[in-house]
Amino acid sequence: MAYQLYRNTTLGNSLQESLDELIQTQQITPQLALQVLLQFDKAINTALASRVRNRVNFRGSLNTYRFCDNVWTFVLNDVEFREVTDLVKVDKVKIVACDGKSESTQNKSDK
């Protein structure tokens, strides 16, 4: 099962809006829209894992953290993101981190 975190991105929201419009005009079924979203979840996770190679450093003050259901959530204040020549400052950032390994990979490594 792929994580659904990226459905709430600009790309994911645009896809959902387009699918909703197609459902309303009866051009596709809700079941097909769900299949498209599931495929999007798999594809975006695979693409980000294999194609993104840029490195960004960030520093901030940890406000809160939580670990629940194998998911880490961090809230940082006064954060600076640095990439080679760029610097971006933001007041607040929420980071959600999930285990990138599939269950089958974890089970093999646990043995």
Swiss-Prot record:
Cellular component GO terms, alphabetical: transcription factor TFIIA complex
Domain of life: Eukaryota
Places the protein is found: Nucleus
InterPro entries assigned to the protein according to its UniProt record, in alphabetical order: TFIIA_a-hlx (IPR009083), TFIIA_b-brl (IPR009088), TFIIA_gsu (IPR003194), TFIIA_gsu_C (IPR015871), TFIIA_gsu_N (IPR015872)
Covalent S-S links between cysteines: none
One annotated GO biological process: transcription initiation at RNA polymerase II promoter
Segment forming the signal sequence: none
Keywords recorded for this protein, A-Z: Nucleus, Transcription, Transcription regulation
Primary residence: nucleus
Database matches in Pfam families: TFIIA_gamma_C, TFIIA_gamma_N
Protein purpose: TFIIA is a component of the transcription machinery of RNA polymerase II and plays an important role in transcriptional activation. TFIIA in a complex with TBP mediates transcriptional activity.
Family per similarity comment: Belongs to the TFIIA subunit 2 family.
Subunit structure as annotated in this protein's UniProt entry: TFIIA is a heterodimer of the large unprocessed subunit 1 and a small subunit gamma. It was originally believed to be a heterotrimer of an alpha, a beta and a gamma subunit. Interacts with NCOA6 general coactivator. TFIIA forms a complex with TBP.
Protein name as catalogued: Transcription initiation factor IIA subunit 2
Gene that encodes the chain: gtf2a2
